[in-house]
Amino acid sequence: MDYKLIAIDLDDTLLKNDLTISERARRAIKASISKGTLVTFATGRMYRSALPYALELGLDLPLITYQGALVKYADGREVYHRPLDLNIAKEVINFVKPFGLHINAYIDDELYMEDATDWGKKYASIAKVPVHFMQLPRELKNDPTKILIIGESEELDQLALKLQKYFLEAINITKSKEHFLEISHPRATKGNALKELAESLNIKREQVMAIGDNMNDLDMIKYAGCGVAVGNAVEDLKNIADVVSKSNDDDGVAEVIENMVLKA
């Protein structure tokens, strides 16, 4: 198959465990772009946190960020923004606060939290973005792009079930990492964003490749003509993927691009 569009997750997929892009992956991506294949990111990261990696690779396609809630070019042109309704966001935060979990809110591509908890400090060090503080939800005045809840995996799994039961289809709930539970606009998913991007470029579904590692990648892996799970992906994602490559630290992304795009 001649793949014309590749969407790649960042954390635990393209990025190594030290949060860098390997030289081999860099070469493979740039070679595929030179061949005429379009490449973008599909990440839960903030736009400003994903942007340095896009600039490093010279990507000129819209970047799918915030799990699909914000799609924006590296030069700043916005394709669309689907934030969480302010009243729903406040209701979610009030629902979650009694559980004592860390909460992040994202407004205008800025990170807000109430306190510099250990979870908050760790997140900020990974994202490499400034932290702003506000009382949540009282000081929340604008629709947030998403809400992120951080805590122990089992607690988040139980909370997700309760949120789903209470809010039904008013929100999208996804687990992006073991300790990250993300709440966003119901249509803000990587799969929806990738589908809209492919259609805007007149690229057929079977000509799309998507590469990821966790359950927030599930709908884009299902949508793509070739859904790839890296070797360190969760088992549920591996089970539905068309291809399972090596792990993020063993150049799984580079391997699949070399074998399925560059050699095609």
Regions found by a protein language model. Give the residues of each.
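Asp-based, Mg2+/Mn2+-dependent phosphohydrolase catalytic module
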Residues: 223, 230-264
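Short active-site oxyanion
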Residues: 36-40, 60-61, 146, 206-207, ...
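Active-site phosphate-binding/coordination module
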Residues: 18-120
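Short, structured coil segments at secondary-structure junctions
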Residues: 57-59, 66-67, 166-169, 223-224, ...
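Conserved acidic, metal-coordinating active-site core of Asp-based
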Residues: 95, 99-211, 215-223, 232
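Asp-based phosphoryl-transfer active-site loop
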Residues: 2-17
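Residue-level signal for inorganic ion chemistry
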Residues: 32, 43, 67, 147, ...
